[in-house]
Amino acid sequence: MDVRQSIHSEHAKTLDTQALRREFLIENIFVADEYTMVYSHIDRIIVGGIMPVSHPVEIGGEVGKQLGVSRLLDRRELGVINIGGAGAIIVDGQRHDIGHRDALYIGKGAKELVFVSNEASRPAKFYYNCAPAHTAYPTKKVSPADVAPVTLGDNLTSNRRTINKYFVPDVLETCQLSMGLTELAPGNLWNTMPCHTHERRMEVYLYFNMEEDSCVFHMMGQPQETRHIVMRNEQAVISPSWSIHSGVGTKAYTFIWGMVGENQVFDDMDHVAVQDLR
């Protein structure tokens, strides 16, 4: 388990490129036949990926020991979105078939967590966010058909995008975790611009659907002290509450956003005008 400490905004603005990447970038999300796990002190979120290829991958008691409990979800909830081939997640003996862009919410208290791919040649890629939980809500599958997409932006400002809200109060009940998927229309490059912060939540982005010769310049920092991190395909970035989180790509891309904190109201954000950015 890779542990990332919290960092003050005054400290963050003094960091060079390598230090920024070390603090906020998660480079290796998917590793064949393993789970990856990054534990952030910021709202205690855990982020990672699971890619079963030649055999199922189980998250067992070894993780619980690192968290001071018996199992990962003794005091946590888990959200998973599959961006790879078809697969399944077995939760306490019950199999949930999870296709491409299907999602599964797993509530507090689940013990057995096994991840499988249907085909080794096209493995599932289970991306997950995991957050502290105070009560148990039912495990529930969410498919793209269950999500009412919202299209925002304009081709003229190169930010036309479709937002799919998977884990939000209108779709299912969670303790604090919110997750969704945003896809840019072809020829559009900007996400979340004009940008915002949200004092009551932190956020993590996973960028994907990117070609090998493309990248995203992820914008971060306080609005008057902006920095950037160059992102490649299937990499994630941690965004503290004080930081903007926006990006511009060399080509269109898709990203998964996950938020934890004290407020699940999607529109609870502090907007920043473009002319106020520095």
Swiss-Prot record:
<dbReference type="Pfam" id="PF04962">
    <property type="entry name" value="KduI"/>
</dbReference>
<dbReference type="InterPro" id="IPR007045">
    <property type="entry name" value="KduI"/>
</dbReference>
<feature type="binding site">
    <location>
        <position position="203"/>
    </location>
    <ligand>
        <name>Zn(2+)</name>
    </ligand>
</feature>
<dbReference type="InterPro" id="IPR014710">
    <property type="entry name" value="RmlC-like_jellyroll"/>
</dbReference>
<dbReference type="GO" id="GO:0045490">
    <property type="term" value="P:pectin catabolic process"/>
</dbReference>
<dbReference type="GO" id="GO:0042840">
    <property type="term" value="P:D-glucuronate catabolic process"/>
</dbReference>
<feature type="binding site">
    <location>
        <position position="198"/>
    </location>
    <ligand>
        <name>Zn(2+)</name>
    </ligand>
</feature>
<dbReference type="InterPro" id="IPR011051">
    <property type="entry name" value="RmlC_Cupin_sf"/>
</dbReference>
<comment type="function">
    <text>Catalyzes the isomerization of 5-dehydro-4-deoxy-D-glucuronate to 3-deoxy-D-glycero-2,5-hexodiulosonate.</text>
</comment>
<keyword id="KW-0862">Zinc</keyword>
<keyword id="KW-0479">Metal-binding</keyword>
<comment type="similarity">
    <text>Belongs to the KduI family.</text>
</comment>
<dbReference type="InterPro" id="IPR021120">
    <property type="entry name" value="KduI/IolB_isomerase"/>
</dbReference>
<comment type="pathway">
    <text>Glycan metabolism; pectin degradation; 2-dehydro-3-deoxy-D-gluconate from pectin: step 4/5.</text>
</comment>
<feature type="binding site">
    <location>
        <position position="196"/>
    </location>
    <ligand>
        <name>Zn(2+)</name>
    </ligand>
</feature>
<protein>
    <recommendedName>
        <fullName>4-deoxy-L-threo-5-hexosulose-uronate ketol-isomerase</fullName>
        <ecNumber>5.3.1.17</ecNumber>
    </recommendedName>
</protein>
<dbReference type="GO" id="GO:0019698">
    <property type="term" value="P:D-galacturonate catabolic process"/>
</dbReference>
<keyword id="KW-0413">Isomerase</keyword>
<feature type="binding site">
    <location>
        <position position="245"/>
    </location>
    <ligand>
        <name>Zn(2+)</name>
    </ligand>
</feature>
<dbReference type="GO" id="GO:0008270">
    <property type="term" value="F:zinc ion binding"/>
</dbReference>
<dbReference type="InterPro" id="IPR027449">
    <property type="entry name" value="KduI_N"/>
</dbReference>
<dbReference type="GO" id="GO:0008697">
    <property type="term" value="F:4-deoxy-L-threo-5-hexosulose-uronate ketol-isomerase activity"/>
</dbReference>
